[in-house]
Amino acid sequence: MSRYRGPRLKIVRRLGELPGLTRKMAKRKSPPGQHGAASKKPSQYRIRLEEKQKLRYNYGVTEKQLLRYMQRARRAKGSSGENLLQLLEMRLDTTIFRLGMAPTMLSARQLITHGHILVSEQRVNIPSYQCSPKEKISIRSNSRSRKLIEGYMSTMGSIVTPPHLELKKEKLEGNIQEIIDRQWVGLPINELLVVEYYSPKV
């Protein structure tokens, strides 16, 4: 299943706040569609499915990628749900987004694939690259890269940088201090429902 390219606010109306997909908020609170406002108790399957879809749309990953992350999370020690969120949050595109260098995950992904981003002084063009503590995130030393990211940052206003990251705004650099803690995950999500959704599949 490919990444979503359709109307973003339609997804926000259905699933709720998704900061990685768009910073805009839906004016109408009811789900999209002709019968969106009709009250109907959702099934347990639908509740789990929609929670899983929040991860897909917020982090901009495919179903195949998300399944692989879930498999890795299950193999690791500790809570599978928290492991899954940490894997998604420590991606390079998510890190760029959480540092406030890009307004959405898609914008962060484009910065990376177009070669603007360095990790510990080495160019990395893979958005799914897993960042590690003590790595430094910076941009290429050319005016185009700096102008692009400064433009993004000037339009986003005040951004709260999570404690596992350190932003040096003047230098357009960030340091990864540690693996992110669950309480600082940038998405309202019940990861246990996602684990339950994938239980028959992994």
From Swiss-Prot:
GO cellular component: chloroplast; small ribosomal subunit
Subunit description: Part of the 30S ribosomal subunit. Contacts protein S5. The interaction surface between S4 and S5 is involved in control of translational fidelity.
Protein name: Small ribosomal subunit protein uS4c
Organism, as annotated: Nephroselmis olivacea
Taxonomic superkingdom: Eukaryota
Every S4 RNA-binding domain range: 90-152
Residue ranges the record marks as coiled coil: none
PROSITE patterns (UniProt xref): RIBOSOMAL_S4, S4
